[in-house]
Curated annotation (Swiss-Prot):
It is an enzyme of class 6 (ligase). It comes from the Bacteria. One of its GO terms (molecular function) is aminoacyl-tRNA deacylase activity. This is Isoleucine--tRNA ligase. The gene is ileS.
Length: 939
């Protein structure tokens, strides 16, 4: 038999079957940087509508982890998709550079006793080094951005503009100084922001403590309970606490005004307990008790008890925050160490200088504190319990495992500790309106802004709303060295800021703009204050790093990168923890400065967990490093994994999951390779066929592609990337692989190379390739560029310099789709029958079969519409269509062909050998080889 392979139009392409991503991707990255692709994209997009995704800055410390990779890849997908959608979508990456973690790194390397200016210099150098390390890894992921000109919160211009932002808050009255309990970390030696506190289980002592009644208050207490006199027994009001270390600082006792409290007679004396908790409390104390009387909490207001071991009073105050869900229903109040306690005591007139605060910054009691001076609060706990037992005030002692505040950096317990700090006020400022009369409070502005913001996923709105509604004032001052200063001068006697503070803030900002934050720390106050210098102290506090990142809408979008940006940003995108972090701080500063959020929408992604849903940790050995994935499988696989995962929940990753992603990629690549290989000899300008002259099935493929593009571009706009991956998979596997290109192979391979039928098919494939390449480019960016180069585009060109592909216009798409869906359903039934023949060993390939299809109604009409090309659609050597009256009569009859097989097209036909010169060929192949070529109308 002659070899007719060379007479076929065999597919050919330089696009390899194997991607070799890990080896080839670095070359693409280098190419993009060499030809300054980001700048070219900016130039191509100039004048389009802006879409600004503002980058939440990662902290400049340590290598990037898988969470960073997820975040940056999601951002890149969005920025690229918006660019392709016709927007000018710049991406300016940023870094958070100040703060304690970097200070700690410098202390580790150089010790704790460096001069402050030298420490700041080393911190700046360290942050710059870390940025370069992280930048290299982000670029390796294929993230396109202004990497040569990122924003850094330690840039002099950013530091200066942050001071100006602080000035705006000061000018509008949101900034105030006050004594309040704030989150305090002993290891940091500083206050913590809400976002720097995390909760972990902690085992704490749980004790019940009796405070004895003052002798001369017995009649008053009897009256409160409706009694004439009290029995001649000691009287205790009993509290329950898990923080014995706060007992030395007790200054009051809180009851709920509406709760019922009972006076209970026990062998140990008369006890005051909440009625709802009496039984459980007496069980803890192992005491029998008899209720003598009951009263509402309001009746106990201002009755005095005595501190268990110090000679001072502890009055009863009313507090709505007291609950009856645990303990005794009475809360001991140490106003220096609890926000509710502080509010309650100050409401009752307690002055700041009356609040007892013996715990020092390092967590030890002041040496002057009787019994416990010099001890750490944790070491003091058992000694305080012993002291309470010694004086007869310990009613019960045990332990409790509960969720407790910990420092996010040190993983050590933190406390509330009253210190004089600077706050951004959420409601009202002491002694004056928070803002100009008639305007809203910051809390009201922020809640309104939350309502006006679009959230992806939608549940984020309720979460952020709740956080804003319930949060305390924001403590923005820190007692640290490496940070943007709060450059105020405070009067030595009154503590009030200098009357020219706004003017002075701007003068400091101008100096910082030239010399960085050292300009403040090295400043001789006399240079700015003149003769006032003797009356004022220069502040040493620095700003919370969340204020650094939280004001980037001011310092970056309207500051260092204003020319490339837009305010407000279209989108902020971060992990779900940023509802209490960057989303939160940005919202507060935005509302304080501008009265609105600095973003139109917020998108949150979940955290990455291992294949079993467990949190990753080095100790568990389940960490997946993005660098390792890129080096082994390619960053493209990481990008595809991110896109294919529903990021609204936890993102699961493991070797097995990545292996499945590799398989998805392989299938997509093979489909694309087929498209490229079968358009290798095609030039759209030279060989393109007008859409009106395409075959019917090509029109169907075009309609499918248009439908896909509409879905995909819509999913990009809705940030639903996992749906895109699924849609591309289905299109490649089902619409193309299992149907269109399966049918198309005969026309592509066997018809004349330049026949209208083949060129029409190639034109359709070219448009499909163009559309898919652009649709996948935001996700599979390396592969899209590879395809772009293979399709004959100039080396200086890039898919990112274009927009979504403009598909040829086609009328009656809905009719075509509906008709061909009927044809596909009939074809599926034919394939089932053929598979049965194959299982019985009666046929091998489907071309060995001849079929008879019985159809009725719309199905018959659809099948009849393709005329004599039906057997091409069914991939059989012969197909007969018979009309029947009802669906019940429909069916498929199939049998092996009795004819010979053509040596070229492999169809079984009765006209084999009709040309004596080619006895092994069918008439169709003879026409295609030596005649004018066959005529195709539909397939």
């Amino acid at each position: 038999m002659a070899d007719y392979r060379k007479t076929l139009n065999m597919p050919d392409t330089p696009f390899p079957m194997r991607g070799d991503l890990a080896k080839r991707e670095p070359g693409w990255v280098a190419d993009w940087q060499a030809k300054k692709l980001y700048q070219k994209v900016r130039k191509a997009a100039a004048g389009r509508p802006k879409f600004v995704l503002h980058d939440g800055p990662p902290y400049a410390n340590g290598d990037i982890h898988i969470g960073h990779a997820v975040n940056k890849i999601l951002k890149d997908i969005i920025v690229r998709s918006k660019t392709l959608a016709g927007f000018d979508a710049p991406y300016v990456p940023g870094w958070d550079c100040h703060g304690l973690p970097i200070e700690h790194q410098i202390e580790k390397q150089h010790g704790k006793h460096l001069p402050a200016d030298r420490a700041r210099e080393l911190c700046r150098e360290y942050a710059a080094e870390q940025i370069e390390r992280q930048k290299k890894d982000f670029i390796r992921l294929g993230v396109l951005g202004d990497w040569d000109n990122p924003y850094r919160t330690m840039n002099f211009s950013n530091e200066a503009d942050e001071i100006r932002a602080l000035g705006e808050l000061f000018r509008k009255g949101f900034l105030f100084k006050g004594l309040k309990p704030v989150n305090w970390c002993f290891d940091c030696g500083s206050a913590l922001a809400e976002a720097e506190v995390e909760y972990q289980d902690k085992k704490s002592p749980a004790i019940d403590v009796g405070f004895p009644l003052v002798d001369n208050e017995r009649d008053k207490l009897a009256h409160a309970f409706g009694l004439d006199t009290l029995p001649e027994q000691p009287v205790y009001i009993v509290i329950w606490t898990t923080t014995p270390w706060t007992i030395p600082s007790n200054q009051a006792l809180n009851v709920h005004p509406e709760l019922i409290y009972e006076l209970v007679e026990t062998p140990k004396g008369l006890l005051i307990l909440a009625a709802e908790l009496r039984a459980s409390a007496l069980e803890r104390y192992q005491l029998e008790g008899r209720v003598l009387a009951a009263a509402r909490g309001v009746a106990l207001d201002r009755i005095n008890f005595r501190h268990p071991f110090y000679d001072r009073l502890s009055p009863v105050f009313l507090g709505d925050y007291v609950a009856a869900d645990a303990g005794t229903g009475i809360v001991h109040s140490a106003p220096a160490y609890g926000l509710d306690d502080f509010v309650s005591c100050t409401r009752y007139g307690m002055r700041n200088d009356e609040i007892l605060n013996p715990v020092q910054a390092d967590g030890t009691f002041a040496g002057s504190l009787p019994f416990f001076g010099g001890l750490s609060v944790w070491d003091a706990n058992p000694k305080i319990v012993d002291k309470l037992a010694e004086v007869g005030s310990l009613f019960a002692s045990g332990t409790l495992t509960h969720s407790y505040m910990h420092c996010w950096r040190h993983k050590t317990p933190v406390i509330y500790r009253a210190t004089t700090q600077w706050f951004v006020g959420m409601d009202r400022l002491p002694g004056r309106e928070a803002v100009e009369p008639g305007s809203a409070t910051l809390r009201e502005l922020a809640l309104k802004a939350v309502d006006e913001t679009q959230f992806y996923p939608a549940w984020g709105k309720a979460r952020l709303h709740s956080m804003i509604a319930n949060r305390p004032d924001w403590c923005v001052s820190r007692q640290r060295n490496w940070g943007v200063p709060i450059p105020l001068f405070l009067h030595k006697e009154t503590g009030e800021p200098h009357p020219r503070s706004l003017e002075l803030l701007e003068q400091v900002a101008q100096r910082v703009e030239q010399h960085g934050i050292d300009a403040w720390f090295k400043l001789d106050a006399a240079e700015l204050l003149g003769s006032d210098v003797a009356q004022y102290d220069k502040m040493r506090d620095t700003l919370d790093v969340w204020f650094d990142s939280g004001t980037t809408h001011w310092t970056v979008l309207r500051g260092s990168h204003a020319a490339d940006s837009q305010w407000p940003a279209a989108l902020y995108l971060e992990g779900s923890d940023q509802h209490r972090g960057w989303f939160h701080s940005s919202l507060l500063t935005g509302c304080a400065i501008d009265g609105r959020a600095p973003y139109d929408a917020l998108l949150t992604h979940g955290f990455v967990v291992d294949g079993q849903g467990k949190k990753m940790s080095k100790s568990k050995g389940n960490v997946v490093a993005p660098q390792e994935v890129s080096d082994k499988l390619g960053a493209e696989i990481l990008r595809l994994w991110v896109a294919a995962t529903d990021y609204s929940g936890e993102l699961t990753i493991s070797k097995e999951i990545l292996d499945r992603v590799v398989e998805v990629y392989r299938r997509l690549r093979n489909t694309l390779r087929f498209l490229l290989a079968n358009t290798g000899d095609f030039d759209i300008a030279r060989d393109g066929v007008p859409v009106e002259e395409w075959l019917d099935i090509d029109h169907y493929a075009l309609a499918l592609t248009r439908r896909l593009q509409e879905q995909v571009t819509g999913d990009y706009a809705r940030f639903e990337f996992h749906k895109i991956v699924q849609a591309l998979q289905n299109f490649a596997a089902e619409d193309l692989g299992a149907f269109y290109v399966d049918i198309l192979k005969d026309r592509l391979y066997t018809t004349k190379a330049d026949s209208r039928a083949r060129r029409a098919a190639q034109t359709a494939l070219w448009h499909i390739t163009q559309a898919i390449t652009r649709m996948m480019a935001p996700i599979l960016t390396f592969t899209a560029e590879e395809i772009w180069r293979v399709t004959g585009n100039d080396a200086e060109d890039s898919v990112m310099l274009h927009t979504w592909h403009e598909l040829p216009e086609l009328g009656a798409s809905d009719e075509i789709l509906a008709r061909w869906e009927l044809i596909r359903s009939a074809r599926a039934e034919v394939q089932k029958v053929l598979e049965s023949l194959r299982s019985d060993g009666r046929i091998g390939a489907s071309l060995q079969a001849e079929v008879r299809v019985r159809a009725s109604g719309a199905r018959f009409d659809a099948l009849a519409s393709v005329g004599a090309d039906l057997h091409f659609v069914l991939i059989t050597s012969r197909a007969e269509l018979v009309r029947v009256e009802t669906e019940a009569d429909e069916g498929v009859d199939a049998a092996p062909s009795s004819h010979q097989k053509c040596g070229r097209c492999w169809h079984f036909r009765e006209d084999i050998g009709v040309d004596a010169d080619h006895p092994e060929l069918c008439g169709r192949c003879c026409t295609n080889l030596h005649g004018d070529g066959e005529s195709r109308t539909h397939a």
